[in-house]
Structures are given as structure tokens and as C-alpha cells.
Design a protein with these regions (language model features):
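Membrane-proximal intracellular helices of multi-pass ion channels
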Residues: 1-484
Length: 484
């Protein structure tokens, strides 16, 4: 990798840091509104440090002439998440008086929209800290795509390359130029956040709670302003609004753009969307009926509670209404399986994504047909289009390394001393970016604060690998990547 490319990457990272520093003004204003100026200095100092480092990278970074190759984009993508997390953790250290390990874990959980937390006492926590956590989700949800696509074209870098390295969306392009798509997506993201906040406010939350949860839910993140998560609010309207926002955040944003550009039935016609919604509704009905039979809840209450928790896990959001691990072994195993599903490709959700299951099903059907008709030429199709061999290779490679990554992280957590339930569910929830795990320690009613520091760093790596879909990060450790 050339020195000019590294300097250009440093320049772009500097712009990211400057943007991060400026965004810290929002929690500062929040603190002033709530008359909590005692925490103001923490964000002020963190902002100054971040801004200074950003300026240094910008001034020293950009060479006279340079272009990033596609391979350089992988370093930029991974580097941006790590560098931003490094500085975004500073306010948490200063306000919450926690170790940098805990602060980095919380920040990586926020930026990757995982939602696992080491903090408690959220109901009385600093409003500046709460809004900052929600902002990390919100910024992570969009993946800094809007900013990156606005900046990279100025540097003569194709913005769609960053789309490809941060997202598994391989659907057709909905706009001729990536920066046009980015503009639409940012407007949609802002609009959905605003609509969600207003709806939650109307349903019974305070404006501050509504804004925090709108940012957390649309990004499928999961941070809340209460230790009890959504269980803190008993109004059914709040729960149903949350379900809708989580689903909206889990649908392909490119199809929203297509809808706005005149393709009115783009979402409805998409096989991935239909499969995702169908899977959710079927799971709601099945598990809701099961909970009604095995509890004292009315059917409507059981259906609502299940809808929130199932949608939360499937969309990798991580909010909860009650502790579903207390429902029995069937529920525990079911929610563990649901951890892997994920939302739609091209959304803010994590996990394996629905389209991979659908492509695998299409491959199974074609293989069975081939067994019946050995000499027939059977074309593999998905969503009406032939499945390219590169897509199949990518799916198989990703699925293999996805499984291996979870297994290795779980083994590492067990080696550190965690019980097998905490180790396995912790690894799965980190790589799938879900949030809560299973068991009494990291389940919906617990948090990650009691874990050893080594376990937190290992889970942090898992969050990053999962968010960037593993291969984007793993390519950096191959010798051939650095050879030329």
C-alpha cells in the first residue's frame, strides 16, 4: 500500500473526527437544556481533543495527488469505525467514571448498533450521556454513508465502493449516481427518525425519551433511557410504535429510494421484504399463542409482548419488554435461533440477513430438482434474477466464516472463564449485533459490566467483525493485502 494512499485515508479519517467533534455539541446543548452543566466539561474536553486530532490528520494527511484503489477502501472502512470509536468513548470515561475498556465497549456497541451495555442506573443518568449513546446508534446505523459518499467523490473515489464494503446489499442500483442515492437515504433516515419520535411522544413518552428511542430503534440499535428498556413503559401504543420503527429500520433503504423515485410497489414486490414480513408475522402468531397457553397473559397482551421481543431480536435491535429467558427452555432456545436471522440486506440491521436464507433455500430447491432430473439445466434464480456465481461464492464464504467466528469467540470467552450459556450467546449476540444475550448475566435483565476486561475486548472485536460482515476486516490481515 502506497504512502500516498495512507495519507489520503488519514485525511478522510480526520474529516470523520472533525464531524464527530462537532456532533458533540448536541449533548452539550442537551445538558444546558436540562441544567446539568456539571457534565458539560466532559464533552467540551472530548470535543477539543477529537477536533484537534482531526485537524492534524487533515492538515498532514492529504497528498497533492492520490486516488484510493478498491483495496484501500477496506482499510478506510475498518479504520473509520475503530478511530471513531476510540474518540467517541472519551465522554463516557469522563462522565460515567468508567474504565476506558468499558467506555470503548459501550461505544463500539453503539456505533455497530449492537446495543449491549455495561452501564446501569440509566433512569437517572446524565441526559448528555443518554443522547450521546443514542446518537452513536443513529450515526452507526447510517454507517457514515452519507458523509463518506459526499466526501469521497471530491477525492475522485467512487462512492458506491464504500457502499459495497459496508453493506451486503447486492440488489440493483436505484439511482445512477451514488451521491444521489446517499442524499435520498439521508433524507429518509432523518424523516423516519422524526416521524418515529413524534409517534413515540404521542404514545406516551416524554419528548426526550421519544427522541432517544427513535434514534435507537430506526438504527436497530437498542440503547434505552431506562434499565428496564421498553418494559419501563406499560402503554401498549408505545410498544406497537416501537415494533413499526424497528421494522422500518430493517427494510432495504434502497427500495425506499426506489419507491420515492416512482416505483410504487418496489417494497411489496421484493422477495426479501415479503419473506422478512412473513417470517415475523408467522413467528408472532406461533410464539404469541404458545405464551398465551403457558402464562396468565391475555392473548392480546401475549401477542404484543412477543411481537416486541421477537421483532427486537430478529431485527437485531435488542430492546426488550420483560425477561423472555424466564419463559422456559423452549423460549430460550428459540430466541437463540432468532439471534442469527437479521433484517433485510441494505438496512441498518445485522445478522445473517433474510436474503441469505432465501438464496440458500433456492439452492436447496435447485439441488433437489437436479437429483430428480440429473441431465436438466436448472437455472438458479432469486427475486426474478439469475444468481451469479460470485454471489454464491460470497454467500458460502461469508456463512462459513460467520459460523467459525462465533465458534472461536465463544471458545475464547469460555477460556476466559465464562459459563457456556454466556459464552455462546455472548459471541452470537456480538457478531450478529443483537445486544442482549441469554442467561442471568447478559440476558435481557442483565448487562455486560461484570464480565472480565478480556471478555469485553473479545466481544468488541466480534461486534466490529459482525457489523462489517467479517470479510471486510479479515482481508486486512492477509499478507497479500499489504504486499503491493
Amino acid at each position: 500500500m502506497s504512502l500516498a494512499a495512507l495519507r489520503l485515508i488519514a485525511f478522510i479519517l480526520g474529516i470523520f473526527l472533525i464531524t464527530l467533534a462537532v456532533s458533540m455539541a448536541i449533548p452539550m446543548v442537551t445538558l444546558l437544556v436540562f441544567d446539568r452543566s456539571d457534565d458539560l466539561s466532559a464533552f467540551l474536553w472530548a470535543s477539543l481533543v477529537t477536533f484537534t486530532c482531526g485537524i492534524l490528520l487533515v492538515v498532514r494527511g492529504r497528498p497533492e495527488t492520490a486516488q484510493l484503489r478498491p483495496r484501500d477502501m477496506y482499510l478506510l472502512t475498518t479504520g473509520s469505525w475503530v478511530v471513531v470509536c476510540t474518540f467517541a468513548a472519551l465522554p463516557m470515561v469522563l462522565i460515567s467514571h468508567i474504565s476506558y475498556t468499558d467506555a470503548f465497549f459501550e461505544t463500539m456497541s453503539g456505533i455497530t448498533t449492537t446495543g449491549s451495555t455495561v452501564l446501569s442506573g440509566l433512569d437517572t443518568a446524565s441526559p448528555g450521556l443518554l443522547i450521546w449513546r443514542s446518537m452513536l446508534h443513529w450515526l452507526g446505523g447510517i454507517g457514515f454513508i452519507g458523509m463518506a459518499v459526499a466526501i469521497l467523490p471530491l477525492l475522485r473515489v467512487g462512492g458506491m465502493r464504500l457502499f459495497q464494503t459496508e453493506s451486503s446489499d447486492w440488489s440493483e442500483k436505484v439511482t445512477p449516481r451514488s451521491h444521489v442515492a446517499a442524499k435520498y437515504i439521508l433524507i429518509l433516515y432523518l424523516s423516519l427518525t422524526g416521524i418515529g419520535a413524534i409517534a413515540l411522544w404521542a404514545a406516551g413518552m416524554t419528548p426526550f425519551e421519544a427522541l432517544n428511542h427513535a434514534m435507537s430503534l430506526i438504527s436497530t440499535g437498542g440503547f434505552s433511557t431506562s434499565d428496564a428498556s421498553l418494559g419501563h413503559w406499560t402503554q401498549p401504543a408505545i410498544h406497537w410504535v416501537a415494533v413499526v420503527i424497528m421494522i422500518l429500520g430493517s427494510l432495504p433503504f434502497t427500495l425506499y429510494v426506489a419507491t420515492l423515485r416512482g416505483h410504487r410497489f418496489a417494497l411489496i414486490k421484493d422477495k426479501q421484504v415479503r419473506g422478512f414480513i412473513g417470517f415475523l408475522v408467522a413467528t408472532w402468531l406461533a410464539v404469541g399463542t404458545w405464551l398465551y397457553v403457558h402464562s396468565e397473559h391475555s392473548w392480546l397482551d401475549a401477542f404484543r409482548i412477543v411481537a416486541v421481543n421477537v421483532t427486537s431480536v430478529v431485527t437485531t435491535t435488542g430492546v426488550a419488554v420483560g425477561d423472555y429467558t424466564l419463559w422456559g427452555s423452549f423460549a430460550v432456545l428459540l430466541f437463540f435461533y432468532l439471534t442469527f436471522v437479521g433484517g433485510c440486506s441494505g438496512s441498518t440491521a445485522g445478522g445473517l440477513k433474510i436474503f441469505r436464507f432465501q438464496v440458500a433455500a433456492a439452492l436447496l430447491v435447485s439441488s433437489l430438482k437436479q437429483l430428480i432430473h440429473p441431465r436438466a439445466v436448472i437455472q438458479k434464480k432469486y427475486n426474478g434474477h439469475p444468481i451469479d456465481e460470485d454471489i454464491l461464492r460470497s454467500l458460502l464464504t461469508f456463512s462459513f466464516f460467520f459460523t467459525i467466528t462465533i465458534a472461536l469467540i465463544a471458545l475464547g470467552l469460555a477460556l476466559i472463564g465464562l459459563d457456556w450459556t454466556t459464552a455462546l450467546s455472548g459471541a452470537a449476540t456480538a457478531v450478529c449485533n443483537v445486544g442482549p444475550g441469554l442467561g442471568t448475566i447478559i440476558g435481557p435483565a442483565g448487562n455486560f459490566s461484570s464480565l472480565p476486561d478480556a471478555a469485553k475486548w473479545l466481544l468488541t472485536v466480534g461486534m466490529l467483525l459482525g457489523r462489517l460482515e467479517i470479510l471486510t476486516v479479515l482481508v486486512l490481515i492477509t499478507p497479500v493485502f499489504w504486499r503491493y
